[in-house]
């Protein structure tokens, strides 16, 4: 149904149009997208004839500043905060509305010699400012267009047009599939574009390294930041992990209540301590401490989930009642940190098969699963049983 991102990039580089779909829980629509650098009157005419939506030009903040393109409104109340600037026509155009003149305006917008005074305002081309970070920060068509342009090595600007059915309704995925077939156009999703970027781009930065003496032994601690969010992660390294043999690794998600306060609701604290002790005994290994509190939902939402558990919901049902998946964690950032440490082959301390699949999806080889089972407590027996029954954890209870 959907094409690979690589296929879409090849078509875009040839000046072709692609269809990009967003999430069904967001706008749930598809846009025609082309590279602004290769725009032609024929492409504009195709978009307005078969797309029927508004032709917009996603650009970076740099373009907007250079051409003095102010926001369309001072107070943006759009539900998705689409960053429209004032609309423009190039001064060489007449009405500015024809396919030829709209293409001219777009071409001149990209001209490095153009100045703000070279454009009349308002006009018939609608620039949109993409957020820095692209779809990794905002999963919109604006950011998708600029990201695709960058991935093609083109000027960071696109041309987009919403796809509307002949009866005036918004085209949804079944309609978009037929459209793609009719015009032999590649169709991709923003979700796949996000995954592609996460897989192919380096998103972590090694910030600081120290020696950390602990109750379990002395470790080499390395602090990491990442470009996706403000979360900071830490890797505790023991011994020489540069040797080619598989390395014992624990990827541990932060649990303030368990790790720090010794909560009996979970087994996180004992798992953390046992992993550190086991790595120390082996004399070589890595404990990666990820700031993914509450399986990714955050501390306050975890406490809200606990409240629901007190009312009879299990850990999975509580997450879902709060509007979250059972497990919101993504292992891409953790995988990049492990790769930065030079690891390729792992002996993974885990009871969670999803964690194995998550890391292997980023080209890390898990050669062995090393169980990390703690004695159950009266207060967490039900929690652990739910992890077995609903999350597939490998525990002997």
UniProtKB/Swiss-Prot annotation:
Mg(2+) 1 binds at residue 27. One of its GO terms (cellular component) is cytosol. The record marks 124, 162 as: Essential for DHBP synthase activity. Mg(2+) 2 binds at residues 27, 141. Binds 2 divalent metal cations per subunit. Magnesium or manganese. Binds 1 zinc ion per subunit. Residues 200-397 are annotated as: GTP cyclohydrolase II. Residues 1-199 are annotated as: DHBP synthase. The keyword Zinc applies. It catalyses: D-ribulose 5-phosphate = (2S)-2-hydroxy-3-oxobutyl phosphate + formate + H(+); GTP + 4 H2O = 2,5-diamino-6-hydroxy-4-(5-phosphoribosylamino)-pyrimidine + formate + 2 phosphate + 3 H(+). D-ribulose 5-phosphate binds at residues 26-27, 31, 138-142, 162. GO terms for molecular function: 3,4-dihydroxy-2-butanone-4-phosphate synthase activity; GTP binding; GTP cyclohydrolase II activity; magnesium ion binding; manganese ion binding; zinc ion binding. Pathway: Cofactor biosynthesis; riboflavin biosynthesis; 2-hydroxy-3-oxobutyl phosphate from D-ribulose 5-phosphate: step 1/1; Cofactor biosynthesis; riboflavin biosynthesis; 5-amino-6-(D-ribitylamino)uracil from GTP: step 1/4. The active site is at 327 (proton acceptor), 329 (nucleophile). Its EC number is 4.1.99.12, 3.5.4.25. InterPro entries: DHBP_synth_RibB-like_a/b_dom (IPR017945), DHBP_synthase_RibB (IPR000422), GTP_cyclohydro_II (IPR032677), RibA (IPR000926), RibA-like_sf (IPR036144), Riboflavin_synth_RibBA (IPR016299). Zn(2+) binds at residues 255, 266, 268. GTP binds at residues 250-254, 271, 293-295, 315, 350, 355. Its cofactor is Mg(2+); Mn(2+); Zn(2+). It holds the Pfam family DHBP_synthase. Keywords: GTP-binding, Hydrolase, Lyase, Magnesium, Manganese, Metal-binding, Multifunctional enzyme, Nucleotide-binding, Riboflavin biosynthesis, Zinc. One of its GO terms (biological process) is riboflavin biosynthetic process. In the N-terminal section; belongs to the DHBP synthase family. In the C-terminal section; belongs to the GTP cyclohydrolase II family. HAMAP family: RibA, RibB, RibBA. Catalyzes the conversion of D-ribulose 5-phosphate to formate and 3,4-dihydroxy-2-butanone 4-phosphate. This is Riboflavin biosynthesis protein RibBA. The gene is ribBA.
């Amino acid at each position: 149904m959907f094409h690979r991102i690589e296929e879409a990039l090849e078509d875009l580089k040839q000046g072709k149009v692609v269809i990009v779909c967003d999430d069904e829980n967001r706008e749930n629509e598809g846009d025609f997208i082309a590279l602004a650098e290769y725009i032609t009157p024929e492409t504009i005419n195709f978009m307005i004839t078969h797309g029927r939506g508004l032709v917009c030009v996603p650009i970076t903040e740099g373009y907007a500043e250079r051409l003095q393109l102010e926001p369309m409104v001072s107070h943006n109340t759009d539900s998705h905060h689409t960053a429209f600037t004032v609309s423009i026509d190039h001064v060489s155009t007449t009405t500015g509305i024809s396919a030829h003149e709209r293409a001219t305006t777009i071409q001149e917008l990209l001209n490095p010699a153009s100045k703000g005074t070279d454009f009349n305002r308002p006009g018939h081309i609608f620039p949109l400012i993409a957020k820095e970070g692209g779809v990794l920060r905002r999963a919109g068509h604006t950011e998708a267009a600029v990201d695709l342009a960058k991935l093609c090595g083109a000027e960071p600007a696109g041309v987009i047009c919403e796809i509307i059915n002949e009866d005036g309704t918004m085209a949804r995925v079944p309609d978009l599939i037929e459209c793609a077939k009719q015009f032999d156009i590649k169709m991709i999703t923003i979700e796949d574009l996000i995954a592609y970027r996460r897989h192919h781009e380096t998103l972590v930065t090694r910030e600081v390294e120290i020696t950390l003496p602990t109750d379990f032994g002395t470790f080499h601690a390395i602090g990491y930041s990442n470009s996706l969010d403000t979360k900071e992660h830490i890797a505790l390294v023991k011994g020489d992990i540069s040797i080619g043999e598989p390395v014992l690794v624990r990827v541990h998600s932060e649990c303030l209540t368990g790790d720090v306060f010794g909560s009996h609701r979970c087994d996180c604290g004992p798992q953390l301590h046992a992993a550190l002790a086991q790595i120390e005994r082996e004399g070589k290994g890595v404990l990666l401490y990820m700031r993914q509190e509450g399986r990714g939902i955050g501390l306050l939402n975890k406490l809200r989930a606990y409240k629901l558990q007190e009312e009879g919901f299990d850990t999975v049902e509580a997450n879902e009642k709060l509007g979250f998946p059972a497990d919101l964690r993504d292992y891409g950032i953790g995988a990049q940190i492990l790769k930065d440490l030079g690891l390729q082959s792992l002996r993974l301390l885990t009871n969670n098969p999803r964690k194995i699949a998550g890391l292997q999806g980023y080209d890390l080889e898990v050669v062995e699963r090393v169980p990390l089972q703690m004695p159950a407590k009266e207060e967490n027996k039900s929690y652990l049983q739910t992890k077995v029954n609903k999350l597939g954890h490998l525990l002997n209870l």
